[in-house]
Amino acid sequence: IDEIEKAHPSIFDKFLQILEDGRLTDGQGHTVYFSETIIIFTSNLGMYVKDALGQRHQNVSYDMTYDEVTRRLREAIGDYFKLELGRPEILNRIGENIVIFDFIRQEAGQAILRAQVDKLIRRLKEQKNLTLVIPDTSYQQLSDAALADLTNGGRGIGNQVEALLINPLSRYLFDSGIIENATVTVVAFETAAQPPALRCTTTKEENT
């Protein structure tokens, strides 16, 4: 259940019944059992908090340690259920089953970037028999640009891959009339261009 904090208060009543009894019964006596069910709530609770004047401020930031992020978020989550919602019993039922995800750091960012590039390479090969080659020097250009700002997480990295690689590659293939059966090597990423562009070389492959 995505962004549970935006749910109507009545939704919490239903989940409280599930968490307490392990089942949910409607007005006609129909019962659904949750004994073999995993329920996952996701939330941005604690990212921002309100001061005494009701102004919204960022509570955690990228430069904090994971321990500090965890402490601040758990405190803010507790305040939300106890003070703002007035429903501490919900938090009591959840107990310690709260997983705090850290901000994406460079190591994780590199893994996400590599996975997205590899996925594109596989898709081009499978669908169009196009071999996309990105030498280490070119890949480093992409990495430096795509991972320069990690505050938007994995989605931000995906947006950068689309802007710096996928869209320029699509334009290059279209302008070059390349449809399939070729090897495209990215010589350089022109990340400062508007829109971003690629310098590529292409070798046509003979059909076998």
Task: Write out the residue ranges for each language-model feature.
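AAA+ P-loop NTPase nucleotide-binding core of proteostasis motors
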Residues: 1-208
